[in-house]
């Protein structure tokens, strides 16, 4: 029972991380399109960092005998204003 609860919580963490990956990549695309190359790169790097977090969490889920669920828990916020992205 404890492992099942742990896997459930870890899968929620995976969902949060996936949501962050999607958001950071959306910001990356928007900044890249607007010519903010440095900021675009920072958002892309942040997305990659989140993917590495997912990898570590997934390893723990598998170690506990669980199944990794790759489902984001929120939709991407469609923000085009760079200042709002940083708020």
Task: Pin down the residues of each PLM region.
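Iron-associated oxidoreductase/ferritin-like identity signal
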Residues: 1-87
């Amino acid at each position: 029972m404890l492992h099942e609860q742990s896997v459930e919580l870890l899968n929620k963490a995976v969902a949060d991380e996936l949501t962050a990956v999607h958001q950071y990549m959306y910001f990356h695309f928007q900044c890249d399109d607007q010519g903010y190359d440095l900021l675009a790169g920072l958002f892309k790097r942040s997305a990659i960092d989140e993917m590495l977090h997912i990898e570590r969490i997934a390893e723990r889920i598998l170690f506990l005998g669980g199944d990794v669920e790759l489902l984001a828990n929120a939709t991407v916020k469609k923000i085009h204003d760079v200042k709002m992205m940083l708020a």
